[in-house]
């Protein structure tokens, strides 16, 4: 009897510890969950604007991925490595340059603040992607008209 109570208590502790960690959110089929968001890497190359539009059509609140921490960056890099099979050198993310004289300000397409950066400081072009050569961990400034695979992110 004591062993049974101990096992039930242990299961209760595990259940309560998983509550709110992301283990209980519901992402669409073939999407991956991380920190209360759902992610999916798409292998079909698109221009940055077309990829953003596609992401908004895939899920409620969907956008090209915003990366807000080193942990999220690692998760996204792993997701890309496992799912993008094309030979493309870059993968689109949702960071873009908003040119408002006299400044150039970077913004995420989902409206979130840029609080984490891992970018090569070259702001000639308006869009950003993750570079394959850096294992998808460094952000590069790219021409928005180029076609690359991309990652979508939406609230869970």
Swiss-Prot record:
Expressed by the venom gland. Keywords: Disulfide bond, Glycoprotein, Hemostasis impairing toxin, Secreted, Signal, Toxin. GO terms for molecular function: toxin activity. Pfam families: Lectin_C. One of its GO terms (cellular component) is extracellular region. It is found in: Secreted. Gene3D superfamilies: Mannose-Binding Protein A, subunit A. Residues 1-23 form the signal peptide. Its main location: secreted. Disulfide bonds join 27-38, 55-152, 127-144. Glycans are attached at residue 141. Residues 34-153 form the C-type lectin domain. Heterodimer; disulfide-linked. Shows greater sequence similarity to the alpha than beta subunits compared to other heterodimer snaclecs. Belongs to the snaclec family. Interferes with one step of hemostasis (modulation of platelet aggregation, or coagulation cascade, for example). This is Snaclec A15. The lineage of its organism: Eukaryota, Metazoa, Chordata, Craniata, Vertebrata.
């Amino acid at each position: 009897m004591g062993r049974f109570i101990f096992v039930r208590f242990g299961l209760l502790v595990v259940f309560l510890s998983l509550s709110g960690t992301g283990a209980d959110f519901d992402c669409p089929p073939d999407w991956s969950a991380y920190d209360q968001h759902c992610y999916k890497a798409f292998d079909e190359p698109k221009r940055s604007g077309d990829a953003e539009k596609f992401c908004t059509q895939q899920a409620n609140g969907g956008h090209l991925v915003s990366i807000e921490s080193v942990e999220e960056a690692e998760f996204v890099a792993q997701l890309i490595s496992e799912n993008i099979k094309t030979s493309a050198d870059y993968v689109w993310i949702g960071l873009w340059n908003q040119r408002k004289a006299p400044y150039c300000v970077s913004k995420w397409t989902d409206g979130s603040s840029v609080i984490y950066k891992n970018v090569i400081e070259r702001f000639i072009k308006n869009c950003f992607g993750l570079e394959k050569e850096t294992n998808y961990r460094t952000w590069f400034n790219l021409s928005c008209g180029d076609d690359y695979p991309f990652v979508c992110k939406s609230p869970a």
